[in-house]
Amino acid sequence: MINKGKGWRLATVAAALMMAGSAWATEYSASFKNADIEEFINTVGKNLSKTIIIEPSVRGKINVRSYDLLNEEQYYQFFLSVLDVYGFAVVPMDNGVLKVVRSKDAKTSAIPVVDETNPGIGDEMVTRVVPVRNVSVRELAPLLRQLNDNAGGGNVVHYDPSNVLLITGRAAVVNRLVEVVRRVDKAGDQEVDIIKLKYASAGEMVRLVTNLNKDGNSQGGNTSLLLAPKVVADERTNSVVVSGEPKARARIIQMVRQLDRDLQSQGNTRVFYLKYGKAKDMVEVLKGVSSSIEADKKGGGTATTAGGGASIGGGKLAISADETTNALVITAQPDVMAELEQVVAKLDIRRAQVLVEAIIVEIADGDGLNLGVQWANTNGGGTQFTNAGPGIGSVAIAAKDYKDNGTTTGLAKLAENFNGMAAGFYQGNWAMLVTALSTNTKSDILSTPSIVTMDNKEASFNVGQEVPVQTGTQNSTSGDTTFSTIERKTVGTKLVVTPQINEGDSVLLTIEQEVSSVGKQATGTDGLGPTFDTRTVKNAVLVKSGETVVLGGLMDEQTKEEVSKVPLLGDIPVLGYLFRSTSNNTSKRNLMVFIRPTILRDANVYSGISSNKYTLFRAQQLDAVAQEGYATSPDRQVLPEYGQDVTMSPEAQKQIELMKTHQQATADGVQPFVQGNK
């Protein structure tokens, strides 16, 4: 016997009776009172001739006592049990050395893997691989963990691909868990039934039945996961496959039969009255949704187009639009109807609008000076310049025609196409024509077109006039009448814009802006007609709501000087002016185009913008009234304040009152007396 306490130790490890012969084995009796655990381990190692390594974390005191004599195997199991009680375990190494560690660390150490032939005994740490054939290890593992010594180093892991369990722990506990697995791993009565559906969708039916079974088990159902029926959809044949024990299968089959009914007689048509969207356009969108539904429910049929009829899951799907009430009429099975209803609800929303304001600023300034002197001789010869007015030859012919025939047609034609001053002198055979013209043009154009449109909707604004332009002439068959062909060209302010609202209150604007006007009228007898000044901007810009940005601009300055003269004579100082014609023109033009979008997401913002525009226009009317002195005149029409009814003239109000009086008297059977003005 070995004893330790109070500074003395008594160890007796010899056999109580030593007898010759191999029939007698060594026996041990051990008792430790308040002994250090390291001393206990060292004593056992010495008695069993084992080399034992102690982990530094192994500390503490033990109190154990054995009243029986133990053989070597029993003595070793006694050693393992004592360590187990105090939270430690022994891990045997390949070289025969034993390692003492904490129990929770033993499962990650090199503990032996045992099998059916050598399962291990007692409290030695082992790992065992247990194959399972009839039960899912995923469902079985949580149950075994509750039976294992998890705090003492036990562990249960499942491996789904091979459907095996890896159990780690004390050999006695592991063997007990293996026995539990053997008793549970029994093949059940798993027959299969196939139900062919006529009306419902197999996928939706399985989803519904699975949810019902799940809810029943979660609310206290006594059907185990092993005995719970399995329901699978075969969408290729639109069938439901049910497996499980007979009673569970019968209940599922009855449920499926009751749900697989024709719902047309139960009313599967609904009318959706749209608030914001257009029913006709919505139908086109729902066609694409129907194609997606067809793909999801391929086992049940095909989708339909608007007004058509095809089946999905054995039911009919039809979508049409009633434009008079702006409504959608949809016929579909309940599950399909629910999906389409969600799509309609998300599409039928109030779309944001965009107020687009453009500012076109153009400032032009031009100066011109034309001077010319022309000579002619009745015997032939002369000088003629047309850059400063009519030629002297045309004037001479028109004057001779007037002198000989008294006809003024030629002179009228020349006067019609001439600007400025013209003076003629003649003496003997010589005639002189002096022309002079000075021009000074200034223009300041400010255009502010604005338009409100829906998001992703093109809108156009056009204010202008149609100007006739002669494109050709044609003589009649008799030759005495000339017909002119006219084409009208629109000039003014044109704005075409398509806004797209992006995230962060930014707007992508596709803009086409044009400002055109009638320019200078062509002079002379060529009949080419007027010229047109056109300013066009066409681009796409990204602008934040409420910000003003420039779209483009032009700064143009032109200087033109033209001199026509008689060689040599025109170069003589001072006298040379009598033999030449000069034309000087200078023009400057500055043009800038700005744009500002404003997002209108709700009615309040829209109303505020409208109020500002309305109030500005009314203020301009009031200013005009004050300037004209009509502030107290009842005949002057002024817009009322924003939100109030339009004020009618006193004469119109009088006529309405007379009409009401007449209607009331007619209803009472009395002929009203109305005195007219005399």
Curated annotation (Swiss-Prot):
<feature type="site" description="May serve as a pivot that allows opening of the central gate for substrate egress">
    <location>
        <position position="464"/>
    </location>
</feature>
<dbReference type="Pfam" id="PF00263">
    <property type="entry name" value="Secretin"/>
</dbReference>
<keyword id="KW-0732">Signal</keyword>
<feature type="region of interest" description="N3">
    <location>
        <begin position="267"/>
        <end position="348"/>
    </location>
</feature>
<comment type="function">
    <text>Involved in a type II secretion system (T2SS, formerly general secretion pathway, GSP) for the export of proteins. This subunit forms the outer membrane channel.</text>
</comment>
<comment type="similarity">
    <text>Belongs to the bacterial secretin family. GSP D subfamily.</text>
</comment>
<dbReference type="InterPro" id="IPR004846">
    <property type="entry name" value="T2SS/T3SS_dom"/>
</dbReference>
<dbReference type="InterPro" id="IPR050810">
    <property type="entry name" value="Bact_Secretion_Sys_Channel"/>
</dbReference>
<feature type="signal peptide">
    <location>
        <begin position="1"/>
        <end position="25"/>
    </location>
</feature>
<dbReference type="InterPro" id="IPR013356">
    <property type="entry name" value="T2SS_GspD"/>
</dbReference>
<keyword id="KW-0998">Cell outer membrane</keyword>
<dbReference type="Pfam" id="PF21305">
    <property type="entry name" value="type_II_gspD_N0"/>
</dbReference>
<dbReference type="GO" id="GO:0009279">
    <property type="term" value="C:cell outer membrane"/>
</dbReference>
<comment type="subunit">
    <text>Forms a cylindrical channel with 15 subunits.</text>
</comment>
<protein>
    <recommendedName>
        <fullName>Secretin ExeD</fullName>
    </recommendedName>
</protein>
<dbReference type="InterPro" id="IPR049371">
    <property type="entry name" value="GspD-like_N0"/>
</dbReference>
<feature type="region of interest" description="Secretin">
    <location>
        <begin position="353"/>
        <end position="602"/>
    </location>
</feature>
<keyword id="KW-1134">Transmembrane beta strand</keyword>
<dbReference type="GO" id="GO:0015627">
    <property type="term" value="C:type II protein secretion system complex"/>
</dbReference>
<feature type="region of interest" description="N0">
    <location>
        <begin position="26"/>
        <end position="122"/>
    </location>
</feature>
<feature type="region of interest" description="N1">
    <location>
        <begin position="124"/>
        <end position="188"/>
    </location>
</feature>
<dbReference type="InterPro" id="IPR038591">
    <property type="entry name" value="NolW-like_sf"/>
</dbReference>
<keyword id="KW-0813">Transport</keyword>
<dbReference type="InterPro" id="IPR004845">
    <property type="entry name" value="T2SS_GspD_CS"/>
</dbReference>
<dbReference type="InterPro" id="IPR005644">
    <property type="entry name" value="NolW-like"/>
</dbReference>
<keyword id="KW-0653">Protein transport</keyword>
<dbReference type="GO" id="GO:0015628">
    <property type="term" value="P:protein secretion by the type II secretion system"/>
</dbReference>
<feature type="region of interest" description="S domain">
    <location>
        <begin position="604"/>
        <end position="678"/>
    </location>
</feature>
<keyword id="KW-0472">Membrane</keyword>
<dbReference type="Pfam" id="PF03958">
    <property type="entry name" value="Secretin_N"/>
</dbReference>
<dbReference type="InterPro" id="IPR001775">
    <property type="entry name" value="GspD/PilQ"/>
</dbReference>
<keyword id="KW-0812">Transmembrane</keyword>
<feature type="region of interest" description="N2">
    <location>
        <begin position="189"/>
        <end position="264"/>
    </location>
</feature>
